[in-house]
Swiss-Prot record:
GO biological process per UniProt: intracellular iron ion homeostasis; peptide metabolic process; protein processing involved in protein targeting to mitochondrion; protein stabilization
UniProt-annotated stretches for the region Disordered: 423-450
Record-given protein name: Mitochondrial intermediate peptidase
Active site feature: E594
Reaction(s) this enzyme catalyzes, per UniProt: Release of an N-terminal octapeptide as second stage of processing of some proteins imported into the mitochondrion
Length: 811
């Protein structure tokens, strides 16, 4: 998840439930044709993209995988990544960055010269927005390539590009002349009366950005500020890159610990893996690779708490270097905030967010934690421990202290086994499923693999449901849903040689406005990337070209519709490839979530780049994605979308009921744990960190702070590992990680108000589209919510508004 970046604000980067007895209510709207539906499914699921197995006619040729997605091999047509003619090679990317920098410098000279004229003043903010777009388009595509591309040469070129452009952006952010001209224009009432609301909004945004970048500092201090900002960016990039790395690749266990493993299959797995250990072996010691499935199986099935603890800590340990990088960028952020005159980095970050100040965030989180703990969390923990001898006699506080984080999956297995025995009535024995210790689930078709880690806590229902949700089925189903809600659909779009980073994996979709047949933007989908966690990348933002810009020259770098550059969004996931790839319900949630961001980018149509799509407040941007998870959890949606990958039969509603019930077993606990992460984020960017700077940068100890937060908040408390060094959002969402929870609360209220009655309602979809999605960043988020929910008291966006959201949501 990530939103686009303003000129000076570049960031590297559950919902309401319905009764299962409610029947699916499909509003009477025109849905996509069967031909387009089948074409979408085939594009992701079939070897040859044909309809009904026909491949001997023109229609069949149209669906050829080679013709559609692997480009023309005869050299008749080729381009660069995302149809940017420069991006044909790593060297081309560096050339593109240099061209972009030159374009930006030329534009700055032009603006500085023309601002002396009346027309130059009127065009100034639009050209500032154009300047921002030039740089952000370059740095955003570089960031995408750095994170996603398989070729290290491309990755190295992307890093070089990022450094070139980011350094220049920081120079612009402290350009006194650019700032002074902007201030004069914004303070000229006659000029303001001739500007559009969007121009005024962007002008105010950029003025804030200049001022938050130390524009009032003396030259020496500004230089220090730029250096500090760039150093934070480099450290953050390193932190994110290494966040999935383990402190050690192997963990050793003694022969006594080995004997504590009751499952003979797991023992044999340990012995086989131990034989492959590359280091010096000690007698009576076994070695387990932490990157394998063995540690997870031990935590789920082994009765020895000490052994589970060892596995859990090993999996959650970050390297010492990683923790040190975290300490340093937290300290540098505190120093940056101090230089700008803020009480803390959190105060700096929240000044123009929905929450406005850290005190409001802490109040929101504290109230949420108290409500969760006193209502659902303790109930879930009691249910989880019901089968454990003596646990029923413990007080609430004793129970909370007794259940450790490494007990969670072990207890959950016992809990769900008991639950299944009373609900499935022997269904397990009659269903062909994998054994409890396999890491992937295979159906009777040996070429079909589910893209999920499966363990013994998976129910028969959850395993069987995978067969009804192939990637193609989900994408075609989303097109059907968006057609119903917004009159927008997906159409398979052929790619040209060089347009995508992997011709075998990547698919391109045209996002089509059904009402006028116009293209709204493009999606590039890579669901089986070997190196990327599920992510949303805005590669190009929507923007109307200025009159002086050359359409033909611009068309070499972006995809156009008349005088608009169209939004380009990439969705990347790390699912296991199959033929077809079948998805767990959690992975269906993931696609829906990321598609929420994508549709925000498509529907949020503005003239100016800085306001389009997801370029809104960070604590507002997650609402569309989180709301989509309400759709993915609603049986009225899943039953309409799901169909068996071989037979085409609709998904049985009883399977959805069983699986949904089991998925929510620890819903409140998981929300509470997420609130702990948000609280840690606040603590690491608080006033106390600024005060610690008096003792020197080395006084910042993030591990001590992490363990103290865990001790204070207790539920599944971790006082042993350095997991915080593996939490990338501490950089990419520094001081605003709470936004996930705030937006979940807001999305829940929106769901209850608009969609709970009928998730396919065109009326509800249009209201949501018109009041929330279409504005991008042009309208105050609290005003959007007040209008969408018809709750006028939200419009002020103060602490009371956050309290109202909390009271009306059902987290």
């Amino acid at each position: 998840m990530r939103s686009g970046s303003r000129l000076s604000n570049y960031l590297v980067r559950l919902s309401g439930r319905v009764s299962f007895t409610q029947k699916r209510s499909l509003t009477n709207v025109k849905l996509p044709s069967n031909v387009n539906y089948e074409r979408l499914k085939a594009a992701f699921d079939s070897d040859e993209h044909t309809l009904n197995g026909k491949n001997n006619n023109n229609e069949g040729k149209l669906f050829s995988k080679t013709a559609l997605f692997q480009g023309q091999k005869d050299g008749s047509a080729s381009t660069g990544l995302f149809k940017n003619s420069y991006l044909t090679s790593p060297q081309g990317l560096v050339q593109f960055s240099k061209k972009s920098k030159l374009q930006a410098q030329t534009l700055v000279d032009e603006m500085t010269r023309d601002v002396l004229t009346h027309q130059g003043k009127l065009d100034y903010i639009k050209k500032l927005d154009q300047l921002s777009d030039i740089l952000c388009r370059t740095i955003d595509v570089a960031e995408f390539i750095r994170v996603v591309h398989d070729d290290q040469k491309w990755v190295d070129a992307a890093q070089q590009t990022h450094e070139i452009i980011f350094e220049y952006m920081n120079q612009l952010n402290t350009n006194v002349e650019l700032y002074a001209n902007l201030v004069k224009i914004l303070e000229d009432k006659d000029l303001i009366s001739q500007l559009s609301d969007e121009e005024i909004k962007v002008g105010e945004y950029l003025r804030q950005d200049f001022e938050r970048s130390g524009i009032h500092m003396d030259p020496q201090s500004r230089d220090q500020f730029v250096s500090l900002t760039q150093e934070i960016s480099i450290m953050g990039s390193h932190f994110n890159n290494e966040s999935s790395s383990l402190k050690s690749d192997w963990i050793s266990i003694t022969s006594n610990e080995f004997s504590a493993i009751e499952d003979r299959f797991i023992q044999s797995e340990v012995m086989r893996a131990s034989a492959l250990y590359p280091g010096k072996k000690e007698s009576g010691t076994y070695y387990i690779p932490l990157a394998s499935a063995i540690p997870y199986r031990i935590m789920i099935q082994c009765g020895s708490g000490n052994l589970r603890k060892k596995m859990w800590i090993g999996l959650h340990e970050a390297s010492d270097e990683q923790v040190q990088v975290l300490n340093h960028f937290v300290a540098y952020r505190a120093l940056l905030a101090k230089m700008l005159g803020y009480d803390s980095y959190a105060h700096y970050q929240l000044e123009h967010k929905m929450a406005k100040k850290p005190e409001n965030v802490l109040s929101f989180l504290t109230n949420l934690q108290e409500n969760l703990k006193n209502s659902q969390v303790l109930k879930e923990l009691r249910a989880l421990s019901a089968l454990q001898q003596g646990y029923s006699l413990l007080s609430d506080e004793e129970l909370i202290r007794q259940i450790k984080p490494w007990d969670r999956d072990f207890l959950l297995k016992s809990f769900e086994a008991k639950k299944l025995s009373s609900t499935e009535n022997g269904e397990k024995a009659s269903t062909d499923t994998s054994t409890s210790t396999t890491t992937s689930t295979t159906t009777t078709d040996s070429t079909t693999t589910t893209a999920t880690f499966s363990n013994s806590t998976d129910s028969v229902a959850i395993k069987r449901l995978c067969e009804y949700f192939s990637i193609g089925t989900v994408i075609a189903g989303l097109s059907k849903l968006f057609s119903a809600l917004y009159n927008i659909s997906f159409v398979v779009e052929p790619t040209v040689k060089g347009e995508v980073w992997n011709e075998k994996r990547v698919r391109k979709l045209n996002v089509l406005n059904n009402s006028n047949g116009e293209t709204m933007g493009y999606l590039y989908l890579d669901f089986c990337s070997p190196k990327v966690f599920p992510s949303h990348f805005t590669v190009v933002c929507l923007r109307q070209l200025n009159k002086a810009e050359s359409v033909s020259e611009h068309g070499d770098m972006v995809q156009l519709s008349k005088d608009y550059q169209l939004p380009v969004v990439a969705l990347v996931c790390n699912f296991t490839s199959g033929n077809p790839t079948l998805l767990s319900l959690d992975q269906v949630d993931t696609i829906f979530h990321e598609m929420g961001h994508a549709m925000h980018s498509m529907i949020g149509r503005t003239q100016l780049h800085n306001l389009s799509g997801t370029r809104c407040a960070t604590d507002f941007v997650e609402i569309p994605s989180v709301l989509m998870e309400s759709f993915s959890k609603d049986p009225r949606v899943l039953s309409e979308i799901g169909c068996h990958y071989r037979t085409g039969e609709p998904v049985p509603i009883n399977l959805l009921e069983q699986a949904q019930s089991q998925r929510s077993a620890l819903e409140a606990c998981e929300t509470f744990v997420q609130s702990k992460m948000a609280m840690l984020d606040q603590e690491l960017h608080s006033k106390e960190i600024v005060e610690l700077l008096r003792q020197g940068l080395e006084a910042i100890n993030s591990t001590e702070i992490y363990h103290q937060v865990e001790r204070d908040l207790e539920i599944f408390a971790d006082e042993w590992s350095t997991w915080h060094g593996k939490f990338p959002h501490l950089f990419s969402y520094g001081a605003v990680y709470y936004s996930y929870l705030l937006d979940r609360a807001i999305a829940n209220v929106l769901w209850q108000k608009l969609f709970a009655k009928d998730p396919w309602s065109r009326d509800a979809g249009i209201k949501y589209k018109e009041e929330i999605l279409k504005w991008g960043g042009t309208k105050d988020p609290w005003a959007c919510l007040a209008d969408a929910l018809q709750m006028e008291e939200l419009r002020k966006g103060d602490a009371h508004a956050m309290q109202i959201i909390g009271e009306n949501s059902k987290l």
